[in-house]
């Protein structure tokens, strides 16, 4: 028998923009005492029955033509993009819909952009809650009032202020390729993104938000939400945790089928599929019934999607957050489930001996999301695993560093660094990049590479001589001193010269070394093509080794030439290249290497 399940809803947004406040407001919504089904607390989720939505929304339901048939809404309790990336279901996201919350006064922030990127990648439909309208100057607050009623009570200035802030958000979304409008002005919800102005703190606009997501789910996701009630359950692990009296348990969101006490389940482990039998299905007691923290759960015999449930069973110590849970009823289903879970784990947890970065994340879902981003940036991965950054990870990065310094790093999403790992990383100079924003992690890593490349280039530059061709002025008047050192007037014909550069003649014979370069009263660190300067040449005697009108060349080494061609090519201008060609011709007379350059 098929039924429509509650849509699973995630709340995303930047830190302090109101994600938790919104969830708290939804959780603590008071409904009339006579109401049969109130809001119920699941494990890791909050269920809002449709009757509560209807009571809160009242006349707003006319926004949607036809009756809403959903049984309710299931909100994931852990807000933020970290939780969202962990919640996977068959390659996509576990969430059917998302609410992106933005502080209307602060606008877009780094985690806002990260959240939009993730929603776009997972193709998850979402609405925008423009929060903290109560902070707009002069805003009149009426608790739990629908926005469309509340806005009429505001004076012209407050209304205009909100309108300006909304247009700023709309403009930013437009730059990102989204058509957006205030929810009551949207003509087609398939083409336009809806913004609902709200105050999570006071509940203003929350009725519209609940109606809107109920209506969107009903209208566009009905087929996706139809499930086979009697079918075996499928879910995703939110968290693995110890519970007094139960040992290791897993908190699971069930999104398909029915899970029963005594069912056999297959669960994703670090490098295996764990097969175990359910000992207990637990759901939280209502808060007002908890008298003793040891007895905070009620036992249930079965649970149907969508639901958040705690499973107590043997052998769950190595279960992985973010991995699948599949109930099986016979040997054939068991084989299939085991194969499916192993394939999923193997596609995400990587261990190779190739040169690449070390990647760690808190759950298998976030590991998958981070790995995907790195692949898109063509950053190779040597090892990808779940858990905190360990000493072993740092040592692995060290062995990579010896082969390729830019990949000898550890990149960690939403994880901690073990103390011994930090010590080794400092001692061995292994960079650790840790953040809870994926794109920031990659940005930081790329910025580090850029800085390292610049540093390396500077070191190479400091140790590399550039080619240069100079001509002594033919007039004897420009011989200022004949020896110890010889000082003569010259023009740089091609390339560049610097103090310390050795010089050779056209036949390849060594002449001496440039001691200093002077223009009028100033000593220079460099002279380039077209510059007319005086140079002091140590080791040369005018009339014996060098003569007025003679052309001399900077004596670059083979190593200089190789570095110039291979590593500093982008720093050579046309005149440097010309000088290099001329120098190569001179040096080829004595060494065939230069003929092949």
UniProtKB/Swiss-Prot annotation:
InterPro entries: EFTu-like_2, EFTU-type, P-loop_NTPase, Small_GTP-bd, T_Tr_GTP-bd_dom, TF_aIF-2_arc, TIF_IF2, TIF_IF2_dom3. Residues 4-221 form the tr-type G domain. This is Probable translation initiation factor IF-2. PROSITE patterns: G_TR_2 (PS51722). Belongs to the TRAFAC class translation factor GTPase superfamily. Classic translation factor GTPase family. IF-2 subfamily. Residues 77-80 are annotated as: G3. Residues 13-20 are annotated as: G1. Residues 131-134 are annotated as: G4. The lineage of its organism: Archaea, Methanobacteriati, Methanobacteriota, Thermococci, Thermococcales. Residues 38-42 are annotated as: G2. Keywords: GTP-binding, Initiation factor, Nucleotide-binding, Protein biosynthesis. One of its GO terms (cellular component) is cytoplasm. Function in general translation initiation by promoting the binding of the formylmethionine-tRNA to ribosomes. Seems to function along with eIF-2. Residues 199-201 are annotated as: G5. Signal peptide: none annotated. It comes from Thermococcus sibiricus (strain DSM 12597 / MM 739). Gene3D superfamilies: P-loop containing nucleotide triphosphate hydrolases (3.40.50.300), Translation factors (2.40.30.10), Translation initiation factor IF- 2, domain 3 (3.40.50.10050). GO terms for molecular function: GTP binding; GTPase activity; translation initiation factor activity. The gene is infB. Pfam families: GTP_EFTU, GTP_EFTU_D2, GTP_EFTU_D4, IF-2. GTP binds at residues 13-20, 77-81, 131-134. The keyword GTP-binding applies.
